[in-house]
Each structure stands twice: as C-alpha cells, then as structure tokens.
Amino acid sequence: GFGALFKFL
C-alpha cells in the first residue's frame, strides 16, 4: 500500500 511509502517520506 502507499501508506508504507509515505512512512519513508
């Protein structure tokens, strides 16, 4: 999911 991506940001 994109949630994990935002976690990195």
UniProtKB/Swiss-Prot annotation:
Alphabetized GO MF terms: toxin activity
Chief location: secreted
Location of the protein in the cell: Secreted
Keywords of this entry: Secreted, Toxin
Expression by tissue: Expressed by the venom gland.
Annotated Gene Ontology cellular component terms: extracellular region
Family note: Belongs to the cationic peptide 04 (cupiennin) family. 03 subfamily.
UniProt-recorded name of the protein: Short cationic peptide-1f
